[in-house]
């Protein structure tokens, strides 16, 4: 874990201290949990393509669009 310094206004520092005391945890724990809740935990898994498959759809564009727009 890396050490980070954060400057807090007096009223926010007092709120962190109060929350830590009420929950029986350290102020650092309250701050870590608050940051985690605000920015999320782990990175989201990478998303696949919209039409993820073994063959790129662009290779079949002519076949797939044959007759498109014709009546």
From Swiss-Prot:
Residue pairs linked by disulfide bridges in the UniProt entry: none
Keywords: Toxin-antitoxin system
Record Pfam families: RHH_1
Record carries keyword Kinase: no
BP term (GO), one: positive regulation of growth
Keyword Phosphoprotein: no
Function per UniProt: Antitoxin component of a type II toxin-antitoxin (TA) system. Upon expression in M.smegmatis neutralizes the effect of cognate toxin VapC26.
Protein's name according to its UniProt entry: Antitoxin VapB26
Organism of derivation: Mycobacterium tuberculosis (strain ATCC 25618 / H37Rv)
Gene: vapB26
